[in-house]
């Protein structure tokens, strides 16, 4: 099934093309407790850019079927999908099944555009209408799996079962246990011979909701407000349409993303998607919650999955999955960027973590210490304490050593710190020992651990009293911009260097490597300011 072969379910469902690259509909669930509130939500959904609304009548506190359905369907500003989800399929309705199906038949007679009927009762429902379904009304027969995502064969068999009921549209929603679950849904979706909604629920299933447009899904869901969702992992309409530029995603859109765990805090999608849009580049950039890098790379080996940024804790695992590694990344022992070479599909690993961080630290030192010759780094001879021996820690320790700094590596595990310290001719200590480590004044501190990252913004990797011997403190965390560590360092008189500088500078480099053209630097800076 190609994107162009997916029929609009009804001639009454008119969508302004507006240059969109797909016909995957954007549906907003409406889940208010009263009819009036639902009408307000529907108008809001239209303002936000939805193509249709799913009216979840199982959320209504008081429901008078004939009167309420007539108002909701006739006064809706968008085409309607009526869903009356029972508790046994994950909904709110806990009453008589005959009464529920009678309401569904009434919605059909009143002219809703779409009707959701659960697979479990589909044959019973079709028998009850005796072939009297209006041509305008399209029935979505749905199946929801709240435990896992089955094999491709099992999903394919489920499609056949649903199709056999006479469904106009197939809907299958499964649950993500691992991000690779999405690949199985994509495989079924792209080969489906009938209009199909195929979604994977949960945070690890986000990509199924966004890339449904790439693989020919009939529709995807976007919530009207953040947190008010009809299924786990649902993005907002604003995220779908503005952040991910959903209507511009096509079959040939190139997929990029940031690989990490956790990943919800990442601002990378804001920057890279804005850059792609500004440059007219046909790409999408996703947050990728990955448990196993190797499994992810194996599952998404298509030439359209072309580039990734790497963050905690996967910088080192990413390196192991590369076909070729640039010399700096090899020396550091971690990558921050992976690109699929178009000529042969090989995965190339790079490390650009160090670029922004070292430049920002040097700039801060020059500003506080006065001018130094351009040929000499202000880090030369300084004691540089690097907290964390992961990917970013390795990058900073390595480049600090190259700049002439005396490097001390502190990590939770002494052995890990020792391995890195030995590579840069430095000293190793544990993070627990660091609070009492003050051999001299004017030291430089670089935190590359995740301690203090949103949402645990009250945490700090080092107590305030231990910061008095540092002249400059850098924190690789950029959410929040002002971490507790930086606030307390400034109170102690140290010059602070924000993680946003490291983040933005590596973004400049990666955007150019992903797109082949220079990054729109001011746009990226503006987006970062807006989102931190």
Residue ranges and their predicted role:
Residues 255-262, 351-354, 361, 365, ...:
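Glycine-rich adenosine-cofactor-binding loop
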Residues 365-366, 381, 472, 476-532:
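Adenosine-phosphate binding glycine-rich loop
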Residues 403-424:
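NAD(P)-binding Rossmann-fold cofactor-contacting core
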């Amino acid at each position: 099934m190609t994107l162009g072969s997916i029929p609009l379910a009804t001639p009454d469902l008119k969508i302004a093309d507006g240059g969109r690259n797909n016909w995957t509909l954007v549906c907003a669930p409406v889940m208010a407790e009263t009819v009036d509130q639902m009408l307000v939500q529907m108008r809001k959904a239209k303002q936000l850019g939805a193509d249709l609304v799913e009216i979840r009548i199982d959320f209504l506190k008081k429901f008078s079927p004939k009167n309420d359905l007539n108002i909701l369907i006739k006064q809706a500003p968008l085409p309607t999908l009526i869903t009356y989800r029972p508790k046994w399929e994950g909904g709110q309705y806990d009453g008589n099944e005959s009464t529920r199906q009678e309401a569904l038949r009434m919605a059909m007679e009143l002219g809703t555009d779409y009707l959701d009927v659960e697979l479990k009762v589909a044959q019973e429902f079709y028998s009850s209408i005796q072939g009297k379904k209006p041509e305008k009304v399209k029935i979505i027969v749905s199946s929801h799996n709240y435990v896992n995502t089955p094999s491709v064969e099992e999903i394919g068999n489920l499609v056949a079962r649903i199709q056999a009921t006479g469904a106009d549209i197939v809907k299958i929603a499964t649950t993500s246990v691992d991000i690779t679950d999405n690949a199985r849904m994509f495989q079924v979706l792209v080969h489906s011979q009938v209009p199909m909604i195929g979604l994977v629920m949960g945070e690890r299933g986000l990509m199924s909701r966004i890339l449904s447009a790439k693989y020919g899904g009939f529709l995807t869901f976007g919530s009207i407000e953040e947190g008010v969702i009809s299924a786990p992992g649902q993005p907002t309409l604003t995220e779908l349409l503005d952040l991910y530029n959903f209507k511009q995603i096509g079959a040939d859109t190139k997929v990029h993303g940031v690989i990490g765990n956790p990943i919800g805090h990442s601002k990378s999608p804001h920057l890279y998607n804005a850059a792609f849009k500004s440059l007219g580049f046909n790409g999408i950039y996703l947050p990728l919650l990955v448990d196993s890098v190797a499994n992810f790379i194996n599952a998404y080996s298509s030439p359209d999955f072309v580039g990734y940024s790497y963050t905690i804790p996967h910088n080192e695992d990413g390196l192991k999955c590369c076909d070729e590694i640039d010399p700096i990344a090899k020396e550091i022992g971690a990558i921050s960027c992976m690109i699929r070479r178009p000529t042969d599909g090989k995965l190339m690993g790079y490390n650009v973590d160090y670029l922004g961080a070292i430049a920002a630290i040097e700039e801060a030192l020059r500003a506080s210490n006065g001018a130094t010759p351009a040929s000499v780094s202000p880090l030369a001879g300084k004691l540089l304490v690097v907290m964390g021996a992961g990917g970013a820690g390795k990058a900073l320790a390595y480049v600090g050593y190259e700049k002439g700094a005396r490097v001390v590596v502190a990590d939770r595990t002494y052995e890990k710190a020792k391995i890195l310290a030995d590579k840069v001719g430095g000293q190793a200590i544990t993070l627990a020992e660091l609070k009492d480590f003050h051999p001299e004044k004017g030291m430089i501190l670089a935190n590359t651990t995740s301690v203090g990252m949103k949402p645990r913004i009250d945490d700090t990797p080092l107590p305030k009293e231990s910061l008095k011997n540092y002249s400059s403190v850098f924190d690789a965390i950029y959410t929040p911009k002002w971490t507790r560590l930086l606030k307390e360092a400034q109170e102690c008189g140290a010059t602070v260097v924000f993680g946003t500088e490291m983040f933005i500078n590596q973004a400049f480099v990666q955007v150019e490597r992903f797109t082949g053209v220079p990054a729109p630097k001011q746009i990226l800076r503006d987006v970062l300011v807006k989102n931190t």
